[in-house]
């Protein structure tokens, strides 16, 4: 949520909506997210980074209970005003036979007891009201395969952050198209934003023709998975290396940025230049000096993410103005 948190907040402030959206059962980044407090016990995590036996959607993870009981707890935070309360609480799962679920909301003594609907496709269980926290407990859960929970409103803007660390983006070509279309029925995405590339930047690689080919294939597959969604690709951010004691932009960053532009142009999708928004060449030095990025001269901090989110939001709003004006002329 380094970039997404402030982007989500800005969109919801302007267009309505509340909540962090989809949250996987757990993840390696769970304890670092300031937008949600979460804890999970009694689950086996499967990731498409290491597993080829399960079918995956955008989160790239699926979860199966281990032991007699499994649980999920989530609690909203006040990091942003739009996160404090939500009106919809959902549990998303993609396989089930006869799981018994107990749900406690807002720390009350009242327990909701349900037998989850049997399914072999992506399904959601929903409660509506006013929520700040929830505790899910599962028993007799053999055969259950869970995705996560969603905290949101059913109106306004929902921004889901599907983060899978160590992912170059090309792995999205392995998304299961049937599963993704099932997901799209209950979470109909209007826009899919692809932000990848930083972890493949290397001093030893300046030719990214192979990347262009693979990412074109990936974009085509994402379109098959989410045919009603527009796609926006974010270019790689700046990354510095030290040369004679001075930090400067790695040449590979510029090479990859050119490759990403080619992918977007050839695929007919929108493109936004994060590198340019940072200030262009050697801008990472300024970000580190301002504590907007870590001293590895690679990774943005939450404060740096806020700068990029603000620039992205302004760019989208500017494009919206153009479309609104064109619509007026057309009328």
Task: Give the location of each predicted region.
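Conserved SGNH/GDSL esterase-like catalytic core that processes O-acyl groups on lipids
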Residues: 2-213, 299
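Stable alpha-helical elements in mature extracytoplasmic
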Residues: 3, 7, 176-180, 211-218, ...
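Structured segments of extracytoplasmic/periplasmic soluble domains
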Residues: 6-17, 152, 182-186, 195, ...
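Hydrophobic/aromatic beta-strand patches that form the interior of the parallel beta-sheet core
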Residues: 160, 232, 270-272
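Conserved, well-ordered alpha-helix/loop/beta-strand core segments that scaffold catalytic motifs
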Residues: 191-197, 215-223, 230-235, 239, ...
